[in-house]
Regions:
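Conserved beta-strand positions in repeat-built beta-propeller and related beta-rich domains
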Residues: 33-34, 39-45, 74-75, 81-87, ...
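Post-signal-peptide N-terminal segment of Sec-exported extracytoplasmic proteins
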Residues: 37-79
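A short loop-to-beta-strand structural motif that recurs across blades of beta-propeller domains
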Residues: 47-49, 67, 89-94, 145-151, ...
């Protein structure tokens, strides 16, 4: 699919007003559609929603999980894999396109692996490697921070746990850029990178990040997503507040990160920041950036009881702006956008 402006697609979402009876929905505009544009969202009830941006249909998948956080859709397998907090593992659901769009369907996993995770948070996929963060306080000491990263492999028979590494900080969101894994250092304004992550860390052991960089103006990093040179970071601010969240957009991210010394920070003037009461950002726990539409999708956990938000013109907007799309989804925990 060619490069498009997101506002051309919003009109298709007029039909989506049936998604919820909440008057909070704000979906309008003219539309020219093509290809596939599916937004997947997990929830803390275990339901997965798929919003068809072109048609306005919403499909509800009732999974075996009762709490999910993290999702990846594989067009090759016509399946999605979610991180199950209730099942403490991964679950894959197949033949997704075989169900009628707009239906509510009960699913059983094609295969799963359970029992390893304690408090899973995010999922990053590279080839047949499925990498999951876990922010469990291993020593139950609030003065010492640690987290874990679980590395699974997937084949036609299911998942296998290859190894688990322990980080020297609480870890939340993760994102691959090439072979390097970037991770949000929870409770800080920092991002860490592990170079050649999958090949350098094959054993169960404590690992040290190759570099940690702070971002000026950011309070508490939670989600991150990278595409075509642009990194979007979500800032939940104070966890108890539902109106102090923000998004930080960093263009030419790799060069700015490389130019900053470990322990240093990327200046505010090298970022775009979306924040303020008009944004409806309180606790943006997960984000997806799509460069074709130049849009940011946000899983907003607290404002309005839980919402999915979208911001148009992502690489040029800044300040206290209203989202271009908003609708209520209680318990939303992560989002994934598939387009072609």
């Amino acid at each position: 699919m060619g490069r498009k402006r997101w506002d051309l697609v919003l009109g298709a979402c007029m039909a989506v007003c049936v998604w919820s009876c909440n008057n909070d929905d704000n979906l309008n505009g003219d539309v020219k559609t093509s290809g596939t544009a599916h937004l997947y969202a997990t929830t803390h009830t275990g339901q997965v929603k798929r919003y068809d941006i072109n048609s306005g249909d919403v499909t509800t998948y009732n999974t075996a999980s009762t709490d999910a956080e993290g999702i990846y859709f594989s067009p090759e397998d016509d399946s999605f894999t979610l991180v199950s907090r209730s099942g403490a593992g991964l679950e894959t659901y197949a033949n997704i396109s075989s169900f009628r769009s707009g239906a509510s369907v009960d699913l059983e996993p094609e295969f799963s692996i359970a029992g390893s995770l304690e408090s899973p948070r995010d999922l990053a996929v590279k080839g047949n490697f499925y990498v999951v963060t876990d922010d469990t306080d291993l020593d139950e000491d609030e003065l010492t921070h640690e987290g874990r990263i679980f590395i699974y492999t997937k084949d036609s028979n299911g998942f296998s746990l290859r190894n688990v590494v322990t980080t020297k900080f609480r870890v939340w969101g993760i994102e691959f850029i090439g072979d390097d894994l970037y991770a949000a250092v929870d409770e800080t304004n920092k991002i860490a990178v592990f170079r050649n992550f999958l090949s350098n860390h094959t054993l169960n052991r404590i690992v040290t990040a190759d570099k940690i960089v702070a971002f000026q103006g950011l309070v508490r990093t939670r989600g991150l997503h990278y595409e075509d040179g642009v990194m979007v970071l979500s800032d939940i601010g104070e966890a108890e507040s539902n109106n102090d969240g923000a998004l930080h957009v960093v263009k030419d991210f790799e060069s700015k990160f490389a130019a900053t010394s470990s322990g240093g920070f990327v200046k505010t003037e090298d970022q775009l920041r979306i924040a303020g009461n008009n944004t409806l950002l309180g606790n943006p726990v997960n984000v997806i950036y799509d460069s074709n539409y130049n849009v940011i999708f946000v899983a907003e956990a607290s404002n309005g009881g839980g919402r999915i938000l979208a911001f148009n013109d992502a690489t040029s907007i800044d300040g206290n702006i209203a989202p271009d799309l908003k609708y209520t989804l209680a318990g939303v925990s992560s989002v994934y956008f598939h387009t072609r």
